[in-house]
Regions:
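C-terminal closing repeat unit and adjoining cap/tail of repeat-based domains
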Residues: 2-5, 33
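Short loop/turn segments that connect beta-strands within beta-propeller blades
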Residues: 4-8, 53-54
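Beta-propeller fold detector
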Residues: 10-17, 58-64
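Serine-hydrolase catalytic core recognition
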Residues: 23-224
Length: 224
């Protein structure tokens, strides 16, 4: 929370909101420091929070019912290093007792375009059909998206598009190096611009993937 101070300065204070979550402003009061926030994460369904920004207090008002058992699951945010040395953050959701021997079936996804920010979100299907059964899920924040501002987006435009594909491959290589998974156990998925990403990865780095799910892709870029 940023507060104006005398002399044109601003002070800031952190709110104790959940880590590794997507926070959105639902509504505010023009005549007070009160607001309602939406909090969404990989393991917790969307919840409504009341915030008194002046007092710095938070209260969870209500939460949608859970659709899968998140007990024993955890979320980490890690970084891979792309070909040009840029650090590429990614989220991984997995069981607490994961074996670091490359045996965990893993789904890796990303978008990487149009300033779209890929942030934590609750997916009943992913949780029930994949995470509950021992799989890991990875969301990569590659360049081309809007997660870290205009420069992050512009770093993957036009003649710099290859950086996006290098970023995605770097995340896969990092997962394999950390032994979360292995090429035979690593599947990738993406749609639309993410489908184009999958098509490129399938052709450029086929040795990294055990399965590729290409959804509504833009593949014929010469006539697009």
């Amino acid at each position: 929370v940023y507060t104006p101070e005398p002399g044109g300065r601003w002070s800031r204070r952190a709110l104790a909101l959940p880590d590794n979550a997507t926070i959105g402003i639902v509504d505010t009061d023009l005549h007070s420091d009160q607001a309602f926030l939406d909090v969404d994460s990989f393991l917790t369904p969307s919840s409504l929070w009341y915030a008194d920004l002046g007092a710095g207090t938070l209260e969870k008002v209500k939460t949608l019912p859970p659709k899968f058992d998140a007990a024993g699951l955890r979320v980490e945010q890690l970084e891979a290093v792309s070909r040009d040395g840029t650090k590429i953050p990614y989220f991984i959701v997995h069981r607490n007792e994961i074996k670091l021997d490359g045996s965990t079936p893993t789904i890796l996804t990303a978008y990487g375009g149009f300033q779209v920010s890929e942030t934590p979100y609750y997916s009943a299907a992913t949780g029930k059909l994949w995470l509950e059964r021992g799989g890991a899920f990875v969301l990569a924040n590659i360049r081309g998206g809007g997660e870290f501002g205009p420069a992050w987006h512009e770093a993957g435009l036009k003649t710099k598009r290859q950086r996006i594909y290098d970023d995605f491959a770097a995340v896969a290589e990092d997962l394999i190096a950390r032994q979360y998974t292995s090429p035979a156990r690593l599947g990738i998925r993406g749609g639309s611009n993410g489908g184009l990403l999958m098509g490129v990865e399938f052709n450029q780095r086929p040795e990294l993937w055990g399965a590729v799910d290409i959804e509504v892709p833009l593949l014929d870029m010469m006539r697009y």
